[in-house]
Amino acid sequence: MVKNTVKHVDSSKHLEKVASLIKEGKVKKICVMVGAGISTAAGIPDFRSPETGIYNNLQRFNLPYAEAVFDLSYFRKNPRPFYELAHELMPEKYRPTYTHYFIRLLHDKRLLQKCYTQNIDTLERLAGVPDKALIEAHGSFQYSRCIECYEMAETEYVRACIMQKQVPKCNSCKGLIKPMIVFYGEGLPMRFFEHMEKDTKVCDMALVIGTSLLVHPFADLPEIVPNKCQRVLINREPAGDFGERKKDIMILGDCDSQVRALCKLLGWSDELEKLIDTSVETLTEEISLLSVDSTIEKNASEQKKDDNSVNPFTKIEEKKKDEVTLLVSDDE
C-alpha cells in the first residue's frame, strides 16, 4: 500500500545520498526496476490517461472493455485492435530516453545486477542493455509465435506486417501470430521467476524508476529485497510500500530530470551524453535501413499478391548477413 503520510520529500538531499553510496563503493549490485514512466519522455503514451492514453485511442474499435486489446480470447476473435496498437508502439518511431541510457551506463560500469522492466517497447534493448542483463517481465515485441501451433515467427515478417497494419499469420498452420507480450490470464516469462529470487537476494540497491507498482507479481520485487538492501524510488509520486522501511529513499519528480541530476552528482554527465550521441547516430542509420526494407517489402507484396494468400506478404526475402536488425539481442 502507498503511504499517505508522506508530507515532504527532499529530493536533492536524497539524490546526494544515492550518489554518495555509489561513489564510495557501498553499492555494487543494483537491481533496476522500471515502468512506463521512463518511456513517456520518448513520446510513448501511457495506457490510462483520459485524453492521450492508449486505451482512449482504441475506443473507435468499440472494445467491450479497454483491456480487451490484451485479452487472448478477444484477440482470437478480433486481432486488429491489438495490431493497431502494435503499429503505434513500433520501436522505429521512438528513441530511448536519458533513463534508458543511464541503465546502460550502469551496465557498462559493472554496477547493474539486472534490469527488470514492465515495458514492452524494447527501448532498453535499443539503448544497448544486453539480453543477459534484462528481464522483460511482461514480454516484448522482440519475439513472436503462433497462438495455435506455437511455431516461432520471423521477426522481420512480423515487423513488416505491423508496419503495414496487417495481421500476420503462421506460415505452417495459418493461425494468428502474437508477439510474446503477456496478455491477461497468461503467466509471466519463466525467466522472470528464475532470476528474481537470486537477484533480489544479492542486490545491495533496488532502484525503482517510473512505476506506480500496482501490477503484481512485478510489484513484489522491491518488497522482497532484504532489509539490508537500500531501496530507492524515482517517480512522480510515492509508490508501493516505499516509506515503510527506515532506509527508504524517495526522489519525487520527472524520471529523466532526476536521473540527469544524479549523473551530474556522480560525475557521469559527459559519459552519458557521449553514449547517447553515439547511440543516436547508430540508431538513425539502422532505422533508415529498415524504412527502405519496409518499402521494398510493400512493393514486393503488391507485385506478388495472391488472392488466396492469408498473409500480406507472400515471401520475405532472405536477408544479407550484414543487414542491420532493429531489435538486437546481445549474445556475448
Curated annotation (Swiss-Prot):
NAD(+) binds at residues 35-55, 118-121, 210-212, 235-237, 255. The gene is hst2. Its EC number is 2.3.1.286. The lineage of its organism: Eukaryota, Fungi, Dikarya, Ascomycota, Taphrinomycotina. It is found in: Cytoplasm; Nucleus. InterPro entries: DHS-like_NAD/FAD-binding_dom, NAD-dep_sirtuin_deacylases, Sirtuin, Sirtuin_cat_small_dom_sf, Sirtuin_class_I, Ssirtuin_cat_dom. Residues 7-269 form the Deacetylase sirtuin-type domain. Its main location: cytoplasm. The active site is at H138 (proton acceptor). This is NAD-dependent protein deacetylase hst2. Its cofactor is Zn(2+).
